[in-house]
């Protein structure tokens, strides 16, 4: 989804739980390859904003649009009254010409630290409130990505690493929880490993977490499951069972961005292809942010 008034194409969509609204981030993304590092590749944003899409009206607008704040990975709370996301602040970009900004981000990628944020949403007016820091990761020289709230609204699950936000490439990345009732933040020790944990999701009843991990060989992500009990405690993770167990050993591809469903998917890959590529494109209209 594109519009000249939006930074770039929209990614990381999250549907409102009841209304025909979608929040995205709009990201200018690039990658660099390491020559002398334990990591293989670094994926990073040169810029990113949050955008809101009204499906029925076919209207898109910016939620937050700043030069120095990189907002990404938005998700709605289960009641639809709040959006969670992550944000890194790079004040130096405010004084740099556009020609130097990408180079600055490349040279300082290890100093990009994303906090977990939230912002209130008023359904009646379609307006957003003031951003609030949920987890101050930057003060600990850490960086968060992919916040997701449990279906009961009690727990905020996110990935925490040393820097950046594309943690599927970071061995330091682990799963963390914030108890939104008590405010306590803690790692999922029974689910984490010495290697990468990154993208994740909740089951519809909030009792299971599915996530990607590179604990097996350090190169390919596999899907793991961890039971999350009513007391807010995770249990020992195990790899997703396959009809052929060797599938998890021999597959030279990575699983990515898991989503759990209550029912089997009834559409084929060809059905999705027709919807994505077979229909005529329609321009999306841009509307000024109501907050401005």
Question: What annotation goes with each model-predicted range?
Answer:
Residues 1-292:
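Sequence signature of WD/YWTD-type beta-propeller architectures
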